[in-house]
């Protein structure tokens, strides 16, 4: 269960490109995230975006398995290009968010002792 809703399913390569670009703008700090969850924000947002990216990837792989898809197909190029890079960005942001939480918990433990 995610803390905020996202689009679901597949659309055109251009619409998926626009969706992913919006998420990239959030992760890069160009626009505000959809939630403000303190130190957990980066982790929660990147985890949600990663889940959406993997959903898109799964749907695209199902499409390729069920139909003959040419190598020049726009959705296939999206999956092997932008989507793959976005998944890596989400994983990096998720790791950074996890480290921020760890540091915050360590600081809290030091204050309590």
Regions found by a protein language model. Give the residues of each.
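Extended, charged interaction scaffolds in large complex subunits
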Residues: 1-113
